[in-house]
């Protein structure tokens, strides 16, 4: 074996080393939320935050630890259900609500770490955000598989109870205009289904396409939903990256010197020459797109990855920055 191949193999082994689980003598992780969270947290931190040479692939955990987490989640959900009486079951929150909310808080903190580490220089912002998001998203997808029991047991039940990304109240007003007193329940259900399809089309769903476009569009629609909606574990992470990272970077700064009663941003005119203020990310994109020289292939890659990230976290297709990125990519 050559020195170069040996060196490469050593690096690969170091990168692929899975995280071992806790000692077998540990307390029952399903005994309480605090015990379960203490059991999960090292795995979450390893998958979501550990440094890696391949940002598009999350670090692995030991197969025994992986199986132990599945078992602990199952036992925790089961024990919650068994301890509730029939009367409590009708009024209490579904089992798993506390774990789901704890996971949401975890993603809030993880996303805030990203924004706190952002450079102040606009010229390097996109070079920082794109790999950070790719790493965060890879971890989110890995955690989604690891905690799929939450999706199957808690998220699906919540969606069946009209607590998902699209609720009856969201579509009732528009659908109600076309509903008559003679319409059957099946016909009303079909109208609601059509409304859902229209929403998914905004995120790239093609009715005559593969099921992959449906899954991709629904993931984006979930991430675009308000924080009170129950969505899949991966979309939960992407939604928090939007609320804690992208939205602050997209926010337009308040114009100083304007009167309190007039909060509107002045329009740019040829006579005044006053430019409209832009958010940090918009300024960074402008600088990237208008820069001369440099690595053109790298610039296109950054733009493509940023456009994909904005879509995946639920930034609307009609957002000016998304439209600008799409126009650029159409011409390359």
Where do the model's predicted regions map?
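Eukaryotic scaffold/interaction segments
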Residues: 1-332
């Amino acid at each position: 074996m050559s020195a170069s191949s040996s060196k490469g193999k050593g690096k690969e082994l170091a990168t692929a080393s899975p995280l071992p689980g806790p000692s077998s003598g540990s307390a029952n992780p399903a005994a309480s939320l605090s015990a379960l969270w203490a059991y999960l947290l090292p795995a979450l931190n390893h998958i979501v935050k550990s440094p890696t040479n391949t940002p598009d692939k999350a670090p692995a955990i030991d197969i025994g630890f992986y199986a132990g987490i599945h078992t602990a989640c199952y036992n925790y959900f089961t024990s919650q259900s068994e301890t509730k009486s029939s009367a409590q079951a009708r009024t209490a929150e579904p089992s798993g609500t506390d774990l789901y909310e704890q996971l949401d808080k975890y993603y809030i903190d993880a996303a805030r770490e990203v924004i706190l580490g952002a450079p102040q220089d606009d010229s390097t912002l996109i070079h920082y955000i794109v790999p950070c998001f790719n790493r965060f998203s890879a971890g989110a997808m890995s955690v989604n598989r690891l905690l799929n029991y939450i999706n199957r047991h808690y998220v699906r039940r919540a969606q069946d109870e009209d607590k998902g990304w699209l609720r009856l109240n969201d579509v009732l007003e528009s659908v109600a205009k076309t509903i008559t007193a003679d319409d059957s329940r099946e016909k009303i259900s079909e109208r609601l289904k059509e409304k859902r399809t229209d929403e998914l089309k905004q995120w790239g769903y093609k009715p005559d396409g593969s099921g992959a476009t449906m899954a991709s569009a629904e993931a984006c629609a979930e991430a675009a939903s308000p924080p009170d909606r129950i969505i899949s574990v991966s979309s939960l992470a992407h939604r928090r990256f939007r609320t804690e990272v992208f939205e602050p970077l997209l926010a337009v700064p308040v114009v100083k010197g304007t009167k309190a009663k007039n909060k509107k941003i002045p329009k740019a005119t040829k006579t005044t020459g006053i430019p409209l203020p832009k958010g940090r990310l918009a300024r960074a994109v402008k600088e990237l797109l208008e820069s001369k020289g440099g690595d053109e292939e790298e610039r296109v890659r950054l733009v493509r990855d940023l456009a994909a990230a904005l879509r995946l976290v639920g930034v609307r297709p009609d957002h000016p920055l998304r439209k600008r990125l799409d126009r650029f990519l159409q011409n390359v």
